[in-house]
């Protein structure tokens, strides 16, 4: 019955009776009586009673009993047994007791409502919406009218903000409406002498969070380029349209029921990760699915609708495809640099590789010959642009160590340094 509760509370599912523990078909001796017993147990142990269907299937003369449990609309569906009243959810292939946060979600779903559409205790008159007005004017060309707060679902007729309105307000009263941003030193959170190269914390309106989060990424991401016949090709470390989409989705679809949580932007040498509290709304794990075919599900539909009106996101819900497609369009993209997604019942993370990163061994060897040749070209481009550029600045632009740049220059017969010290200059032979 715990599995029945879990299926009804999640996406529905099937239970098959007549299969042994080692997955051998053994059948049931009295399938009709077993069906009556199972039906009775469901009706007496589950509250409310979920919609289910019992059928039989014969395989090699063995009768199997199949219980199909449908996704419920009157959640939570509680299991009553062992002196307890508990709700269960599906986590992968297992049925697990619903956490307090998951129970809150089930209650909201059973009421056909969402966190962002619920009324708050905050009065409209106590808060300003200059960020909303400014963005709305910029995107639509129209002025934002006070009555639009109600029509957008941000306020009630009697002058109170909804939770979506509280999140949009300039000085959001929702304390966990915030993002933590860190540029880590290395490939993990223990980078050596200095753990972090840059960090920032932002709170307030979700509109400000988007702007500040993107600004943090931009100031910690380098732009490389190479000359072409008539111009030059830019090669960013991270694709702006991809990380914009990931950040907007993280803020719009995060689980605001999880108190004391926040969106995280973590930049490492080789990747950018954007983490948001709360897993997939349907309880599945994104890494076990094809992200391009996942149907759009809005955990916070009011907030998502406002973001659409402000030009931050589209109604059709193509976020995963946008992140992947915009990466694939880059000239420095390879299959190894494809973004990927990871989730569990508590979190969702988008991982976007650094398109210009080349792995090193002991700081002296770059990963591939092609990578070395790319760096040689980029170094010569920088020298042609500024023949007095320092090796230190080259290293910063390339995102590699000073030692690596010096080695690459030493091994490149086409590069020569004329003169000594600061008075000297680079020359391409």
Regions found by a protein language model. Give the residues of each.
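Alpha-helical residues within the helix-turn-helix
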Residues: 396
């Amino acid at each position: 019955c715990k599995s029945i509760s879990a299926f009804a509370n999640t996406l529905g599912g099937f239970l098959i009776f007549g299969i042994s523990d080692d997955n051998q078909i053994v059948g049931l001796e009295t399938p009709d009586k077993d069906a009556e017993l199972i039906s009775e147990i469901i009706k007496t142990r589950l509250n409310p009673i979920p919609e289910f269907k019992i059928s039989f299937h014969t395989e090699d003369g063995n009768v199997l009993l199949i219980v199909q449990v449908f996704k419920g609309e009157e959640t939570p569906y509680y299991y009553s047994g062992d002196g307890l009243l508990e709700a269960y959810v599906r986590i992968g292939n297992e049925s697990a007791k619903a956490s307090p946060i998951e129970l809150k979600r089930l209650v909201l779903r059973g009421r056909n409502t969402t966190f962002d559409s619920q009324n708050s205790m905050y009065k409209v008159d106590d808060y300003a919406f200059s960020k909303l007005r400014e963005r709305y004017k910029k995107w639509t060309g129209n002025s934002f009218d006070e009555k639009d707060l109600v029509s957008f679902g941000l306020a009630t007729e009697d002058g109170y903000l909804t939770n979506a309105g509280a999140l949009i307000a300039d000085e959001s009263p929702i304390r966990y409406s915030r993002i933590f941003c860190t540029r880590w030193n290395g490939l993990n959170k223990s980078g050596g002498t200095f753990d972090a190269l840059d960090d920032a914390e932002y709170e307030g309106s979700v509109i400000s969070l988007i702007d500040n989060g993107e600004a943090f990424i931009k100031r910690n991401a380098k732009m490389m380029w190479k000359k072409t016949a008539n111009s030059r090709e830019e090669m960013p470390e991270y694709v702006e349209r991809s990380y914009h989409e990931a950040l907007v989705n993280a803020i719009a679809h995060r689980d605001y029921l999880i108190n004391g949580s926040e969106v995280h932007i973590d930049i490492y040498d080789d990747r950018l990760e954007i983490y948001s509290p709360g897993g997939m709304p349907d309880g599945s794990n994104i890494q076990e699915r094809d992200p391009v075919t996942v149907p759009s599900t809005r955990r916070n539909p009011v907030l998502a609708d406002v973001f659409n009106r402000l030009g931050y996101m589209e109604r059709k819900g193509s976020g995963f495809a946008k992140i992947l497609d915009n990466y694939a369009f880059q000239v420095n993209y390879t299959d190894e640099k494809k973004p990927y997604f990871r989730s569990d019942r508590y979190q969702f993370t988008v991982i976007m590789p650094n398109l210009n990163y080349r792995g090193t061994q002991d700081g002296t060897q770059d990963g591939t010959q092609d990578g070395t040749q790319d760096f040689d070209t980029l170094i010569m481009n920088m020298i042609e642009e500024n023949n007095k550029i320092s090796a230190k600045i080259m290293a910063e632009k390339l995102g590699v160590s000073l030692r690596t740049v010096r080695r690459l220059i030493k091994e490149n017969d086409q590069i020569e340094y004329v003169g000594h010290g600061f008075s000297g200059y680079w020359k391409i032979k």
